[in-house]
Swiss-Prot record:
Broad class of enzyme this protein falls into: hydrolase
Residues bound to Mn(2+) 2: 264, 275, 438
Organism name: Ajellomyces capsulatus (strain H143) (Darling's disease fungus)
This protein's name: Probable Xaa-Pro aminopeptidase PEPP
UniProt keyword terms in alphabetical order: Aminopeptidase, Hydrolase, Manganese, Metal-binding, Metalloprotease, Protease
Similarity field: Belongs to the peptidase M24B family.
Record keyword Manganese present: yes
SUPFAM superfamilies on file: Creatinase/aminopeptidase, Creatinase/prolidase N-terminal domain
Gene expressing this chain: PEPP
Amino acid sequence: MDESVDRVLAGKYPAKAHAKRVAARIRELGYGESGVIYLEGQKTQMIEDNDGSMPFRQRRNFFYLSGCPLPDSYLTYNIEEDHLTLFIPPIDEDSVIWSGLPLSPDEALEMYDVDAVLLTTDVNTSLAHFCSVKKGKKVFALADQVSPHITFLPFQETDFDVLKRAAEESRVVKDTYEIALLRRANEISTKAHVAVIKAARSAANERELEAIFIATCMSYGCREQSYHPIFASGTNAATLHYQNNNEDLVDKTTGEKRLNMLVDAGGEYRTYCADITRVVPLSGKFSAESRQIYDIVLDMQMTSLAMIRAGVMWEDVHSNSHRVAIRGLLKLGILRGTEEELFDKGISVAFFPHGVGHYLGMDTHDTGGNPNYEDENPKFKYLRLRGTLACGAVVTVEPGIYFCRFIIDPYLASPELGKYIDTNVLERYWNVGGVRIEDNVVVTQNGHDNLTAAPKIPEEIEKLVAATQ
């Protein structure tokens, strides 16, 4: 593990700096110089028709301004006085029997980057006190995240609109501490990907490799997964977000081992996510067709990475990936025509239907990307990030090529579009399923910092697979 990451993470999560950043964004948007930011953490939720609680996931905007993972907590930030207060639950004697003593206010003050820690029973009193001192200013909150017992009546004005935008836009550019968390999530996830690659040849089922990935993440400190892992063997990899992860690696219809395993998985470290995809040849060596597609996708990714720097239009990176895909598929004979004609007609969307990447942070598809899912251009419809890249933003770079009959068949059936695809050549590639290669990178002023060290050079992957029986 990187010791420089340990040194950064030895300090407190910079909640106070984040609160200032959100308040500054509120001012920039024209909503005033003062007031109170109010946020609630996620509530403990019970499983329906059961006395057990749901797995807990802290609200991301609350964590951003508090660094606190505790359920049923609250916070206020007095913008004018630059004062951040965390409210944590009081002792519940019944709960102590089962769960032990909770964190005390003094312990929480020592642990989190806040100015004061009170109990949740003090929230309304604290809000009323602010109004009495400040003659009832404005409160900024999220409309669907205010508990029924909380009252804003003493305030002259309640704004339920700007806080969400201000927080989500503030989260786009990461500070040093956040990048250290993302780097550690990538370090651990890389270890898990390597463990999967080494076990791929001997595994019998997708779930075995998923279990190895999760266990490795857990052992190094990622107690949660960033998202439901994707372990897609053979043609299952043609489904972008395959979820089953439970099929045998030997195809029951042919009796032969499937060609590849697409692994899209990342551990979550202290609320921050890794999102990494690799493709592994299950036999230890890529088939000729698999290697051809892999090389195209790797070229798509490497040329995309070379373009990344502050100020670059993400749409340009995405468009370039389509052009690289078109050139590669033309060379293989899968596509027919000219590069310009195929690009203008959107033929590459049949094989590369998703965006080249998205923001990454506390959410896998992190905030601030401003996607346009109503875009009439199919190349951009599922691009989750639009506009220029900011220095300090973290993005995924994840081009792919897929052989999904559900997506490709309508193109083949179209008299206008089908002529651009050679079905005889295409027939050789269906069993490849899909190839996606995904790294996580920090945008810098003159380039990028790739956080992902998992092997992606095909010879390196083959060597790791083949070395383990």
